[in-house]
């Protein structure tokens, strides 16, 4: 688990804070997306997580250890558990794919035969088993990023930090890289922190998310909680409501339900019990953060406003969230 506590970063006297009292918690095995526009402080925050950037104040706890309190040798050991992938790939063009992935293992002093076995295993994992002897110039952008991911995994990290890793890729390649990251999270149990300016990236694979603006944390939490909170701007951005004409005299609500929650049969049962005639104005199901999320817009006659509210209360007791409009 990573805990960020009241983190501040100021680059110079009189300069605005790049990070201003940011606090958040990244649970173990989460895919945590940090969303924001250019200049929001995303990259600064990510670089602070492994102390490539030293914060001006505040603390970063990783597995309970305060990184800022570690000695140089202790910090080096801690960093061995943190992999990082970059927007620009950062590959050595004079070395083969195999030799690029082997760099962290060479630094760690692993023997040649062990290095080779580990590298070939990783190349199979990222779908480049046939590219070991190729050079970066012979690869596509997506393949280069797969090499970068394999290199980041070489030392067997517990955490993987992704700095806009898909922003230079086309949509199809972006989708394949995100699928690979989701697979790595699922199969290896890594905790992944990724920064992005694209809502679709968060929507595709993130279990948790935070939004930054002007160096400040706007909101954070589990994606499911954000989607179910009518007050969450990030939740509304990830899954916008229905833009329908609104009759102010007619009670309406928007329901949010997840995975195997069966909203339609439950609505039918409860409305029948209350002799309430409901109209379904709109509905749909989408995949968000690896979960199925459904939305329904429902309405009733003005005379049934009391029964309608009772229905929403009964739905809430069964785990289906609603926003009265």
UniProtKB/Swiss-Prot annotation:
Gene3D superfamilies reported for this sequence: 3.30.70.260, P-loop containing nucleotide triphosphate hydrolases
Membrane topology per record: Peripheral membrane protein
EC id: 7.4.2.11
Major localization listed first in the record, in broad terms: membrane
This protein's record includes keyword Cytoplasm: no
Keywords of this entry: Amino-acid transport, ATP-binding, Cell inner membrane, Cell membrane, Membrane, Nucleotide-binding, Translocase, Transport
Domain of life: Bacteria
Family stated for the protein in its record: Belongs to the ABC transporter superfamily. Methionine importer (TC 3.A.1.24) family.
Protein name per the record: Methionine import ATP-binding protein MetN 3
């Amino acid at each position: 688990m990573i805990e960020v506590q009241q983190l501040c970063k100021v680059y110079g006297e009189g300069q605005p804070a790049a990070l201003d009292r940011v606090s958040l918690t990244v649970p173990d095995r989460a895919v945590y997306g940090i969303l924001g526009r250019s200049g929001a402080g995303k990259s600064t925050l990510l670089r602070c997580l492994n102390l490539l950037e030293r914060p001006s104040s505040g603390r970063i706890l990783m597995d309970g250890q305060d990184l800022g309190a570690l000695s140089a040798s202790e910090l080096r050991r801690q960093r061995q558990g943190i992999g990082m992938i970059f927007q620009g790939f950062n590959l050595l063009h004079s070395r083969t794919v195999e030799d690029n992935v082997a760099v962290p293992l060479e630094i760690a002093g692993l023997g040649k035969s062990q290095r080779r076995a580990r590298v070939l295993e990783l190349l199979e994992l990222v779908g480049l088993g046939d590219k070991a002897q190729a050079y970066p110039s012979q690869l596509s952008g997506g393949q280069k990023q797969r090499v970068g991911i394999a290199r980041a995994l070489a030392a067997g990290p517990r955490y993987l930090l992704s700095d806009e890793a898909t922003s230079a890729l086309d949509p199809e390649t972006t989708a394949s890289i995100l699928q690979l990251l989701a697979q790595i999270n699922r199969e290896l149990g890594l905790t992944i922190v990724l920064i992005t300016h694209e809502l679709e990236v968060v929507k595709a694979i993130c279990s948790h998310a935070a939004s930054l603006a002007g160096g400040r944390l706007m909101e954070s939490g589990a994606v499911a909680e954000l989607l179910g909170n009518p007050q969450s701007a990030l939740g509304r951005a990830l899954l916008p409501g229905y833009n329908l004409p609104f009759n102010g005299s007619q009670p309406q609500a928007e329901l949010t339900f997840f995975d195997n929650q069966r909203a339609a049969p439950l609505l039918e049962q409860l409305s029948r019990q209350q002799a309430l005639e409901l109209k379904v104005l709109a509905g749909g199901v989408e995949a968000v953060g690896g979960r199925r999320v459904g939305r329904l817009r429902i309405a009733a006659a003005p005379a049934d406003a009391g029964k309608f509210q009772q229905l929403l209360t009964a739905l809430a007791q069964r785990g289906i969230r609603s926003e009265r409009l």
